[in-house]
Amino acid sequence: MALFEREAFINSVGHTRIKSLFLELSYDNNKFQLFTLKDKDIVNSEGKPLLSIKKLYLDHVSNDPTEYTFAMAIFGTWDIWDTIRTNPSLRRYYSKWREEVDVRIKSEAIRSIAEEMREGGRSSFTAAKLLLERGWI
């Protein structure tokens, strides 16, 4: 089940809401705000809690780089997330989040390889060799 109902993302003519969902992009009406582009969750001027889309994205996508589980968990459908992430107003934010996820995944992989090397398991020599070849140790 998604964090929000589909209706929260669709306007009266059936189009996906985009700018009105974000505090920083909705200029005249905060009725439909659900998210902030800030690093942490906040409360808007009317006392409504807004979730950090960046935080949600990083938490979900680090475990599934396809973004599918994130889309389903938050929006309930891939189409809504795809429309939001490809919107020109959000593209630069999305690119930075994607870059951070890629770095986080690499970091976790390197940590796992280093742990294998330290434990001296069957793959420890290969792990050590990889870390040395890549200049990570």
Show the residue positions of the predicted features:
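Amphipathic alpha-helical protein-protein interaction segments
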Residues: 106-137
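N-terminal, charge-rich alpha-helical recognition modules
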Residues: 1-111
